[in-house]
């Protein structure tokens, strides 16, 4: 949520920034609503004071033996006016609230202009895509050759499309990736491992920005409890700070969390229907940071580097791109996507998004830190990134490390987790 003081002081400036990402703020309507809100707040307070004064007068008049019926009628009329004013004030406040929660974050000035992912800007590349002396197979074909290590038919029987069953060494490789990622981030990058629920309430999803706008992307449990399956560990981990005031000495907070993630992929009909690239259930190791406001841009670069380290240790070619305004997530001020090379597709595909949300999520969550200079609680800054998406990392390993006979070499970094297995 944006700072409402900034909105009221400079709605035109906010509108210009929002227009960069395709959001139109009707400044005249917003100003009129806000002015009406102030008028109604004054009016309700005046009516409340007047009714209180007249109510006291009834007792005094009664003690003097005067006729109190006219005063009672006046108090009743003031009560009706007060209720009407309160109702109108609530309606105006509700409309303003809907505007506030529906506004995306302001893009950082460095974010490139653009309408969609085709206009994202490449920042850097690492590694060289492998050259094969044979036609490279995709991960689906490789999974079939590896003793049915990836079984999409079984998953379709159990559940439906966009799921997978893993078996044997492929399943172990998947688990090894999770352990390797968590070990690296906790031992080398200073993150604390955290385990969280895989179901959250509406307040948590509102805090990180998934609700109310993106309800169609979520799985809601049809049960007595009003819970949702998490689309990412970002939701429960970031909400650890909701309604909290964190001491300055505790910052930065850095968490690494492995969870399954659940997404309906409502807007992805017909996209990536083959294999593991886009699934309803997938594993991810998420990195979350909560920092002082002045530290968040440096933290974004560091967090992105932490995610890149995993790919470098696995010797997987990748590139980093800055998302343009049209591809930027709702809550983000700036996002780097890390895209890994997939030989079968002959292209780079997203494996991590690393974002700085500034104080946008913190304002929605009332997540604050106590500024030692002022002694007052202020919104902190939140960041997160995938470190990494485990399924897509598995796909990248299968395709980049494949051999002509369909077997797959295990990357050196994962061999300590594979119990002596060096080839699948």
Curated annotation (Swiss-Prot):
Transmembrane segments: none annotated. It comes from the Bacteria. Signal peptide: none annotated. HAMAP family: Ser_tRNA_synth_type1. This is Serine--tRNA ligase. The keyword Nucleotide-binding applies. One of its GO terms (cellular component) is cytoplasm. NCBIfam families: serS. Catalyzes the attachment of serine to tRNA(Ser). Is also able to aminoacylate tRNA(Sec) with serine, to form the misacylated tRNA L-seryl-tRNA(Sec), which will be further converted into selenocysteinyl-tRNA(Sec). The gene is serS. ATP binds at residues 263-265, 350-353. Keywords: Aminoacyl-tRNA synthetase, ATP-binding, Cytoplasm, Ligase, Nucleotide-binding, Protein biosynthesis. It catalyses: tRNA(Ser) + L-serine + ATP = L-seryl-tRNA(Ser) + AMP + diphosphate + H(+); tRNA(Sec) + L-serine + ATP = L-seryl-tRNA(Sec) + AMP + diphosphate + H(+). GO terms for biological process: selenocysteine biosynthetic process; seryl-tRNA aminoacylation. L-serine binds at residues 232-234, 286, 386. The keyword Transit peptide does not apply. One of its GO terms (molecular function) is ATP binding.
């Amino acid at each position: 949520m944006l700072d409402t003081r900034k909105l009221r002081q400079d709605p035109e400036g906010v509108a210009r920034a929002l227009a960069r990402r395709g959001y139109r703020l009707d400044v005249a309507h917003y100003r009129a609503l806000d002015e009406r809100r102030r008028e109604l707040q004054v009016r309700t307070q005046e009516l409340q004071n007047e009714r209180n004064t007249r109510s006291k007068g009834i007792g005094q008049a009664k003690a003097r033996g005067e006729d109190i019926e006219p005063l009672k009628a006046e108090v009743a009329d003031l009560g009706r006016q007060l209720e009407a004013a309160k109702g109108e004030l609530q309606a105006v406040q509700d409309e303003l609230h809907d505007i506030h929660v529906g506004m995306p974050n302001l893009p950082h000035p460095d974010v490139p202009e653009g309408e969609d992912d085709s206009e994202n800007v490449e920042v850097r590349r690492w590694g060289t895509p492998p050259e094969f002396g044979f036609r490279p197979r995709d991960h689906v074909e490789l999974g079939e050759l590896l003793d049915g290590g990836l079984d999409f038919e079984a998953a379709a029987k159990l559940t439906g499309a966009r799921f997978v069953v893993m078996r044997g060494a492929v399943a172990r490789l998947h688990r090894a990736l999770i352990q390797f990622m968590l070990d690296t981030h906790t031992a080398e990058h200073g993150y604390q491992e955290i385990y969280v629920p895989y179901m959250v309430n509406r307040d948590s999803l509102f805090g990180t920005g998934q609700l109310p706008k993106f309800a169609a992307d979520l799985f809601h449990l049809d049960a007595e409890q009003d819970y949702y399956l998490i689309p990412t560990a970002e939701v429960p981990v970031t909400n650890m700070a909701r309604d909290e005031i964190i001491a300055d000495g505790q910052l930065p907070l850095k968490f690494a969390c492995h969870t399954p993630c659940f997404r309906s992929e409502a807007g992805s009909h017909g996209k990536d229907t083959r294999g593991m690239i886009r699934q309803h259930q997938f594993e991810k190791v998420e990195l979350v940071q909560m920092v002082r406001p002045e530290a968040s841009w440096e933290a974004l670069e560091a967090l992105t580097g932490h995610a890149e380290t995993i790919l470098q240790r696995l010797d997987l070619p990748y590139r980093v791109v800055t998302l343009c305004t049209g591809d930027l997530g709702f809550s983000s001020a700036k996002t780097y996507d890390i895209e890994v090379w997939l030989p079968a597709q002959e292209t780079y595909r997203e494996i991590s998004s690393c974002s700085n949300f500034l104080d946008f999520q913190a304002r929605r969550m009332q997540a604050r830190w106590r500024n030692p200079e002022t002694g007052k609680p202020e919104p902190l800054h939140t960041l997160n990134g995938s470190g990494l998406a485990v399924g897509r990392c598995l796909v990248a390993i299968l395709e980049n490390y494949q051999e002509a006979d369909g077997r797959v070499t295990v990357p050196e970094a994962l061999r300590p987790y594979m119990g002596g297995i060096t080839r699948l």
